[in-house]
Amino acid sequence: MWNYEKRLQYPINIKNCNPTLAAMIISQYGGPDGELGASMRYLSQRYSMPYREVAGLLTDIGTEELGHLEMVRTMVHQLTRNLTMEQIKGTPFEAYYVDHTVGVWPQAAGGVPFCAIEFQSKGDAITDIAEDMAAEQKARSTYDNLLRLCRDDPDVYEPLKFLREREVVHFQRFGEAMSIIQSKLDSKNFYAYNPEFKK
């Protein structure tokens, strides 16, 4: 189904190690609003989506989120690849180092491991797309928080800014998907029934 291109969606060339920033950015890998959950959410929801164009959108955005996942992992790797023990000690990355050294593993900034309970595939077109819109806004908020933490390093700031912009685009696309779904339902009551389970 997929063709892998050996390049990132946005170039990442981080020159300076920063274990503290890596410990924060990793949340967009395996945190509650991260790219791993987003990709799995959309690629799971597409199967029961009754509207072909919306199922296609879920596939497209879910696939793009896999690319964002690769970007976040690359950032964490580049921020930690040449660390010394002196740079690690006393930083938020120190606890992560104990379990993973400098391997890239999905967890939130607070150390909570990724869990599939953080995303849903409800089997209801309206419910799922409403969740997707909320998920994109939560991810945008997380990127806003990360951007405030790294203004002094353009090598980190610019890729994060790109990822934040994509969250806004995805939110808009899911808004369009909601309009498509609603246009196919009873306009007097959009919530009268589940269009994925008409029984």
Where are these regions (language model features)?
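Non-heme di-metal
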Residues: 1-199
